Amino acid sequence: MGDVEKGKKVFVQKCAQCHTVENGGKHKVGPNLWGLFGRKTGQAEGFSYTDANKSKGIVWGEDTLMEYLENPKKYIPGTKMIFAGIKKKGERADLIAYLKSATS
């Protein structure tokens, strides 16, 4: 997949303002991402999701994240994630590699 260290930099630059990754981490504007892989959309306990996120019904994995992170509002219309997305596939792959290591 991608490079974990490069992915950590992407996370810090583009995601950490709204998300945490550690076990027991608090929700910010976006949900804590611990346990992300294998979890259905809209299921982080204690976070207030939109109906669009709750009803999307997909399971987060490398493929679904690759598509979602390119254009979140296209993948889940009605999401409250205000992030425009990451157009570079390599950057998305690095971020996903980091998320896989940091959230489990």
Swiss-Prot record:
InterPro entries: Cyt_c-like_dom, Cyt_c-like_dom_sf, Cyt_c_1A/1B. The keyword Secreted does not apply. This is Cytochrome c. GO terms for molecular function: electron transfer activity; heme binding; metal ion binding. GO terms for biological process: mitochondrial electron transport, cytochrome c to oxygen; mitochondrial electron transport, ubiquinol to cytochrome c. Pfam families: Cytochrom_C. GO terms for cellular component: mitochondrial intermembrane space. It is found in: Mitochondrion intermembrane space. The modification N-acetylglycine is found at residue 2. The gene is cyc. PROSITE patterns: CYTC. Keywords: Acetylation, Electron transport, Heme, Iron, Metal-binding, Mitochondrion, Respiratory chain, Transport. Binds 1 heme c group covalently per subunit. Disulfide bonds: none annotated. Heme c binds at residues 15, 18-19, 81. Electron carrier protein. The oxidized form of the cytochrome c heme group can accept an electron from the heme group of the cytochrome c1 subunit of cytochrome reductase. Cytochrome c then transfers this electron to the cytochrome oxidase complex, the final protein carrier in the mitochondrial electron-transport chain. Belongs to the cytochrome c family. It comes from the Eukaryota.
